[in-house]
Amino acid sequence: MTCPHPRRWLVVLMLVTAGAVCRPAEAQRLTIAGDRFAVDGGPRFLTFISYFGVMEIDDVDEDLAFLKNAGFDGVRIWPNWRDGPPLMRSDGTLIATAIERLHRVLDSARAHRLVVDVTFTAEEIPGLDAPQYLRAVTAAVEELKPYDNLLVDIHNERDVHGPFGRRLAADDVTSIAAAVKAADPNRIVTASNSPNTSPESAAQFTVDAGLDVTAYHEDRGANWYKAEQIERVVTALKRNGRPAYLQEPTRFPFPSTDRSDYFRIARMNAKRAGAAAWCFHTELGFDVRDTTFKRRLAARVQPEWSFVSELVARIHLRTSDGMHYLVAEGGGGGAVLADRRFPGPWETLTFTSIDGGPVFAGDRVSLGASDGHFFRAEAGGGGALTATAEAVGAWETFVVETNHAGPIADGDQIALRTDTDPPWYITADQSGGASVAVVGHAAGPWETFEVIVAAAASELRLPIPDLTGIGRFDADCRRAGRLGIAGDDQK
C-alpha cells in the first residue's frame, strides 16, 4: 500500500486547461457525414460557444487558446456585429480592414484547431438590400476559401431578420446559398431560423433552400433543457436526413438559466437526441472591447464560469476492491498503477469523448494525466498501460462499457477496452493494489472501475452553488455530477 506523498498536494492542478483535450480528433477539416458533422473524417458531436464580438479586439489568440483548452470544439462569430467594425458596406463590397481582422480571427482559430461558425447578418448595415447582400456574402465566401474548418450561416434568424430589418425571404436564401456553392462547392451552408418557425418547417426549409445543415434557435421557455423537449425538436429537425445544429439555445437571464447544471443537462440531452452540434449561448461574448472574453466569463460564476471551467470531465477511477485508485505515476510521463488509497492530482484524469460531447456508454474516449500526457495501450494492447503519449491516436483510444446505454455518471461501474478486434481490457491486477496492464480478454472484476467525479469546482477556487431546496431538479443535478458526465434522463 502506497500513501500519497505530501508534496503531491502542492502540485498545481494542470488539469484545468493545458493538454486536456484530444488534439488529433479536433483538427482542421469540417465535413458532413450523414446527419452528423465530421472533423478530419471522424463523426463528432460539436460544442460551440457564442463569441459575437470577436471582431472588436485586435488579438484574439489568448481567448481562442483558452476556449480550446477548456474543451470547446468551435466558436460562433458575427463579422457584422453591432459593436464591432462591420465587414460589409451597403453596396455589397467588403471593407479591407475588416477582411484583415477576420483573417486574423480565422488564422488564430485554425492554429488552435477550432471550428468556426461564421454567421452573417444584414440588418446592421444601413441601406444594404437583398441583392447587394448576396453580393457581399459571396465576396466574403471567396475570402473564406483557405479555411476548411468553418461553416457559413447565410443569415441569423432569417425568418425574423434581414435587410432593412425585415426577414430574408426564402427565395433570397435559396439564391445566396446557390451563389455560395458556386463560389465554394464544398462549403457547408445553413441559414438559421428562430422559434417563430417550427422545427418541422425549419427542416423542410433546409431542403427547399438547398442548405446542408438545419440550424435552429429553440424556444426560451422554462423547460428548454429537458430531455423530452430537446428530443422533440431534434427528431423533427433530423427528418430531412441532415445535421441538426442547436445553434442558439436560451441564455442567462431567461428562465432556467441561473445555474450551469441546466446547460450541462441540455448539452447531454442534445447529444442523446442525435443533434450534430450544440452551442453554449452567452451574451458575455457580445462586448469585449475593454477586456477579454475569458475575463468576462470568469466574472460571472453562474452559469458561465462554472459551465466553461467544468466542460472537460475530470474523474478518479477506483478499482473493484473499493480501496485503490488508478494513478499516473509522477502525474504522467511514465507508469500507470492501481496502488493509491487516496485520490489526488496524480489520480485525477481527464475523461474526454473522442466522439464529442459528454461521455456516453460505447463512446471512444481518451484518458489524460495531469501533466498533459495520455494513457496508452502499448503496442495497441496485450501489454503495458502507460501515461506517455503526447497525442491521441489508435493506441490511446479506449471504448467505454457499462450496464446501460446512457451518459456515464458518477458512481457508474465501467470497463475500458481498446478499439481493436479482438479487444484488450484495462486490468488492475488483483482488483487493485498493484500493477495495471491492458491484458484482459473480457470485462470481469479486475477490469471494472468505479467512476468518481473529481471536485473540479473547489480545485478551481470556485464556490459550489447551493442547489438544495429546488426539488426534482436538485436531485437530477446531484446525480448528473459537477462535470457534465450526467445522469440518466433529467426530464
What are these regions (language model features)?
Residues 135, 149-151, 155-305:
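Extracellular glycoside hydrolase catalytic/binding regions
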Residues 66-72, 93-119, 125-152:
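An active-site-proximal structural segment forming one wall of the substrate-binding cleft
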Residues 28-112:
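Active-site-adjacent substrate/metal-binding segments within catalytic domains
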